[in-house]
From Swiss-Prot:
PROSITE patterns: GIDA_1, GIDA_2. NAD(+) binds at residues 268-282. One of its GO terms (biological process) is tRNA wobble uridine modification. Pfam families: GIDA (PF01134), GIDA_C_1st (PF21680), SAM_GIDA_C (PF13932). The gene is mnmG. This is tRNA uridine 5-carboxymethylaminomethyl modification enzyme MnmG. Belongs to the MnmG family. Homodimer. Heterotetramer of two MnmE and two MnmG subunits.
Length: 618
């Protein structure tokens, strides 16, 4: 039997790929262990700055992460709620036992999708085109497309102190065949590192020495159509801090750390450093935050966010004894570092298909990213583009002004990765356009056009969009007269009086007024989220228009295509570094070329002149 597609790995990238492909194609999902499907080997949370927006983008395009998160969440918060809408994002603590179970049940009940427990040894490749896979037991399985989403399981090693063990997270076996084969073909393999903190028994913590961190009482969910009936009581988190005594212990044993003892080859994540890294790099700080987070409603176990380390086990005990609330904490699982093989993503097209091998796609942490959300959105896009390839249709590529997903993939392809890449709001030049609140308005039309959103969901979205447009129009035309009722209302809101009549749209631009003012005057039946959307579009109208204008400028550069057969060595006055980088990345547009490190504005001007002069010949 020949499958339309094989997905290797059932982590957060693999499940999104498989579910998208199974909507239209006969798909095989291969995993080393069905018990590890959608596992959460690091923090038991989904979302956060930029990442939370990505989860909503995944939902708008028909992915599963948002829905599963809503069902498994045990605490939810809106981050940066006091700041502007461009940086707001949801973050949820999720039950690490429930989440994988929810995903597994969905996979098992998905038509066109077969689950197989096994390990892939290598790929079947003929004439630079992937044809299927070979398992370590000798079985060969053919497929028209293959997506590799092996996460941190390629040639992975667990490190604690001076001990090394060949293993993936949670004791799942590592594999070497795929990375060895791709290296022999000519792929650039990079060695990366990440880590995880110790877990401790819930009932061994002295919570009186910590500060409780409750969730927010929100109506919002990650999924745009998640019913409110899924809500349940929230679990608290707790905050404590390291201190100078903690730091003395760490400095004393620094050479015993796997990282500082010289046992780690891989490069670690810049934005999620180990506790020993924090102590060394930020020596002026007297303390560092440690968040104590529940792992599950069904486990007597807490996760110590901020205490990632590769120190020996006895040192981990010593460190805990110095931290308020954790002096008598019993460790249930020791912290460790893990290093693994990944592939520099500049070897991929924007569709996430490899440049060297046709019909082979790579997605997730193996592309040099960190985080469940970054992995999931890559899996989604690889699944969509593998499906389009099977249908002989052009790839689906999101622009930087359309989605954080577009920012992430463009950064990976254009700049490559030498360290684990984390998505940040600061990476998006159009972040005011890429908000948490408008992910469906930006992307759901695409989801429907691609056949990923059903008619019922799309009709619900269309109704929402119509309601927003109606309220926007009414706000612009609704006159606020200077009368006693209106003046009294403004006084109650601590807002300045009116000297002359105005429109509701003009009034709502006052910083002290919000969507409640819209509800007060319009009296239209609509969800709070709809009123909030109208408020944002009115209040930030000028800034949004400016961002859209800048996006249009970028679009003009993106429309200037660079022919694939161009020879950069022939372009006089182009810097040597620019020639090397352009030849390596092979940008498809002038816009992409502007974002390549080592290519400056002078190089772009020279390239533009060359393209215009030699247009007919290329």
């Amino acid at each position: 039997m020949i499958y339309d597609s094989i997905v290797i790995g059932a982590g957060h990238a693999g499940i999104e790929s498989a579910l998208i492909l199974a909507k239209k194609h006969n798909t095989l999902l291969i995993t080393g262990s069905l018990k590890q499907v959608a596992s959460l080997p690091c923090n038991p949370s989904i979302g956060g700055p930029a990442k939370g927006v990505v989860v909503r983008e995944i939902d708008a395009l028909g992915g599963i992460m948002a829905k599963a998160t809503d069902l498994a969440q045990i605490q939810i918060k809106m981050l940066n709620s006091s700041k502007g809408p461009a940086v707001r994002a949801l973050r949820a603590q999720i039950d690490k036992l429930e989440y994988p179970q929810i995903i597994l049940e969905i996979l098992q009940n998905t038509p066109n999708l077969t689950l197989l427990e096994g390990l892939v040894n290598n790929l079947i490749i003929q004439k630079n085109q992937v044809q299927g896979v070979c398992l370590i037991d000798g079985r060969k399985i053919n497929a028209k497309t293959v997506i590799i989403t092996t996460g941190t399981y390629l040639a992975s090693q667990i490190l604690i102190g001076d001990t090394k063990k060949a293993s993936g997270p949670n004791g799942v076996p590592t594999t070497y065949g795929i990375s060895t084969q791709l290296k022999e073909i000519g792929f650039e393999v990079i060695r990366l590192k990440t880590g995880t903190p110790p877990r401790v028994k819930k009932n061994s913590i002295d919570y009186s020495q910590t500060k409780i961190q409750m969730g927010d009482n929100l109506e919002q969910t990650f999924g745009f159509l998640t019913p409110q009936t899924t809500k349940r009581p929230q679990e608290p988190c707790f905050l404590t801090h390291t201190n100078q005594t903690t730091h003395q212990v760490i400095r004393k044993h620094l050479n015993q750390s796997a990282m500082y003892g010289g046992y780690v080859e891989g490069i670690g994540p810049r934005y999620c450093p180990s506790i020993e890294d924090k102590v060394v790099r930020f020596c002026d700080k007297n303390s560092h935050q440690i968040f104590i987070e529940p792992e599950s409603l069904y486990l007597n176990e807490m996760y110590l966010q901020g205490l990632s380390t590769s120190m020996p086990q006895h040192v981990q005990h010593e460190i805990l004894k110095t931290i308020p609330g954790l002096q008598n904490a019993k460790i249930t699982k020791y912290a460790y570092a893990i290093e693994y093989d990944a592939f520099n993503p500049n070897q991929l097209k924007h569709s996430l298909e490899t440049k060297k091998i046709q019909n082979l796609f790579l997605a997730g942490q193996m592309n040099g990213t960190s985080g469940y959300e970054e992995a999931a959105c890559q899996g989604l896009m690889a699944g969509i583009n593998a499906s389009l390839k099977l249908q002989n249709k052009p790839p689906f590529v999101l622009k930087r002004n359309e989605a954080y997903i577009g920012v992430l993939i463009d950064d990976l392809i254009t700049k490559g990765a030498k360290e684990p890449y984390r998505l940040l709001t600061s990476r998006a030049e159009f972040r005011l356009l890429l908000r948490h609140d408008n992910a469906d308005l930006r992307l759901k039309d695409y989801g429907y056009q691609l056949g990923l959103i059903d008619k019922k969901d799309y009709n619900s979205f269309q109704n929402k969009k119509a309601k927003i447009n109606l309220l926007l129009e009414k706000s612009k035309n609704y006159e606020i007269l200077v009368n006693s009722d209106n003046l009294s209302y403004l006084k109650q809101q601590n807002s300045a009086s009116l000297g002359e009549k105005t429109t509701l749209a003009q009034l709502i631009k006052r910083p002290e007024l919000n969507f409640c003012t819209l509800q007060h005057f319009l009296q239209e039946k609509a969800d709070k989220t709809i009123y909030e959307q109208v408020e944002i579009q009115i209040k930030y109208e000028g800034y949004i228009a400016k961002a859209q204008k800048e996006a249009q400028k970028l679009a003009r550069l993106e429309q200037k295509k660079i022919p694939s057969k161009i020879n950069y060595a022939d372009i006089k006055n182009l810097s040597k570094e620019a020639k090397e980088k352009l030849d390596l990345i092979k940008p498809q547009t002038l816009g992409q070329a502007t974002r390549i490190l080592g290519v400056n504005q002078v190089d772009i001007s020279i390239l533009l002149v060359y393209l215009e002069k030699h247009h007919a010949l290329l």
